[in-house]
Regions:
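Active-site-proximal, substrate-binding regions of enzyme catalytic domains
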Residues: 4-128, 137-145, 151-152, 156-162
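Conserved SAM-binding loop
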Residues: 132-133
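A charged, well-structured terminal subsegment
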Residues: 163-168
Length: 168
C-alpha cells in the first residue's frame, strides 16, 4: 500500500531522495505550488546556498515543469482544476512515486500564522488525512505552537515517515 504525503512541488526538486523511496509513495501537491515553480525558475534569487547546488535545483525545477506540461499529464492536472478540492488522476513518476495534484483552496483559516501555500498544505493534510512533508523546521514549529491537528515530518525523517505507521 502506498504512503501518502502532502508536499510542495519544489521539495521534489530540492530533495532528490524523495523520488527514490524504498516503497510506494503518493505525493499530493497543491496546484499553487506548481505555479510557484515557474516563479522560482524565472527568479534571479538563488534557491540554494551553493552555486552548483542552485544550478542543479533549477535544472530539476525545469524537469518538473516539463513533466507537468507534458500533454497527457497536463490533461490530468486540468481535471483537478474544475472544482475546489478535486484531485487529478495519478501521475506516475517511477515504480514507487506517484503524484496527484489538488486544487486546494486557501480559506484564510490560518492566514494569521501561515502563508497561502502553507495554509493549502495544512488544509490538504486535514482533508486527505495525510502528513505534511517539509524541509521548513519553522513550519513544523508553528504547526505545533498553533496546535494545528496535522502530522508533519521533516524531510530528513523521510525514511522513518515512509516506513512507519504514521498516517494521521
Amino acid at each position: 500500500m502506498s504512503k501518502t504525503f502532502i508536499i510542495e512541488a519544489v521539495m521534489l526538486a530540492v530533495h532528490g531522495q524523495l523520488m527514490l523511496p524504498g516503497q510506494p509513495v503518493t505525493y499530493i501537491i497543491p496546484y499553487t505550488s506548481i505555479q510557484e515553480l515557474y516563479e522560482l525558475q524565472a527568479g534571479s534569487e538563488p534557491i540554494m546556498l551553493e552555486e552548483e547546488d542552485d544550478g542543479f535545483v533549477k535544472q530539476m525545477i525545469g524537469e518538473l515543469i516539463t513533466f507537468f506540461e507534458e500533454s497527457f499529464n497536463k490533461k490530468k492536472i486540468e481535471k483537478a482544476l474544475v472544482a475546489p478540492w478535486r484531485k487529478s488522476p495519478p501521475l506516475p513518476i517511477n515504480e514507487n512515486v506517484t503524484l496527484m495534484v489538488v486544487l486546494a483552496i486557501d480559506t484564510e483559516a490560518y492566514g494569521e500564522h501561515f502563508d497561502p501555500i502553507e495554509t493549502e498544505l495544512i488544509l490538504s493534510s486535514m482533508k486527505e488525512q495525510a502528513p505534511i512533508l517539509t524541509d521548513q523546521f519553522d513550519l513544523i514549529e508553528r504547526l505545533i505552537q498553533a496546535e494545528i491537528p496535522v502530522q508533519a515530518f521533516d524531510v530528513e525523517d523521510f525514511e522513518f515517515a515512509v516506513e512507519g505507521d504514521n498516517q494521521v
